[in-house]
Amino acid sequence: MKSKVFFTPVKDAEDIDAVNAGLKLLLAKSGVPAVAEAGRKVVVKLHFGEEDTDSFVRPAHLRLICDEIAAKGALPFLSDANTLYRGKRLNSEEHLGVALEHGFTKDAVGVDIFIPDDT
């Protein structure tokens, strides 16, 4: 079975409002927020980026996704898995530090961040 792929072109990735307008349309067409059940926790799995890089989804876009899920009465939170290779994403404490350095604060995304233990 082929998976559906949703795409919207972005002319200026730095134009947060334009990107979020396309993202909101994609969320509506995909139906992803509709599967969120009121009162249930929903993990939004993402990659917080490596130290000293900018190759990750911007917090403002995650805010929109989490807001759409929360509008259904669900309780979204952000999460990522630690890595097996050396670096600041090898353990949960430093991994959270990288997430915060990249702007994934509760003020920015509106939800908590949970990175599972190292064990």
Q: What residue ranges belong to the model's regions?
A:
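N-terminal and secondary-structure boundary signal
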Residues: 1-119
